[in-house]
Swiss-Prot record:
Subunit record text: NDH is composed of at least 16 different subunits, 5 of which are encoded in the nucleus.
Domain 4Fe-4S ferredoxin-type: 55-84, 95-124
Originating species: Nicotiana tomentosiformis
Entry keyword annotation includes Thylakoid: yes
Reported cofactor(s): [4Fe-4S] cluster
UniProt protein name: NAD(P)H-quinone oxidoreductase subunit I, chloroplastic
Length: 167
């Protein structure tokens, strides 16, 4: 008779513990009910990226000194830097610079360690293509500004500014 009573007490304790766990889970579920949804309707709504978002790399050809620091700090040796030594001025002349975004892990080391700041991360994240070879960007494609910057009305070129007349 005594083992039957202890089994009944254990069963009751397990039932109370299970009900408490179910209640805790239910309270967590209810606490999420008053939050706004995180889901966005992608083609029609765009994500607002954070200030330090690491998207596509922007490259400024004129600033690059072909030092290859970006290649040395890259964990996968990704940037391809082609240069030619100008013997008369004893400096390197950059011929070609390319990055394959199909392989890039967007770690940002190349941007952080570049001595001339010719590399920067943009907020552009839409890099999908049907052919993986289209993800290999040369210096011309890397030099293009992202669409969010091009369409931003607050950024104007000097040619678009109103002319000031000096009279």
């Amino acid at each position: 008779m005594l083992p039957m009573i202890t089994e009944f007490i254990n069963y009751g304790q397990q039932t109370i513990r299970a009900a408490r766990y179910i209640g805790q889970g239910f309270m967590i579920t209810l606490s999420h009910a008053n939050r706004l949804p995180v889901t966005i309707q992608y083609p029609y709504e765009k994500l607002i990226t954070s200030e330090r978002f690491r998207g596509r790399i922007h490259f400024e050809f004129d600033k690059c000194i072909a030092c290859e620091v970006c290649v040395r700090v890259c964990p996968i040796d990704l940037p391809v830097v082609d240069w030619k030594l100008e013997t008369d001025i004893r400096k390197k002349r950059l011929l070609n610079y390319s990055i394959d975004f199909g392989i890039c892990i967007f770690c940002g080391n190349c941007v952080e360690y570049c001595p001339t700041n010719c590399l920067s991360m943009t907020e552009e994240y839409e890099l999908s293509t049907y052919d993986r070879h289209e993800l290999n960007y040369n210096q011309i494609a890397l030099g293009r500004l992202p669409m969010s910057v091009i369409n931003d009305y607050t950024i104007r070129t000097i040619s678009n500014l109103p002319q000031i007349k000096n009279e």
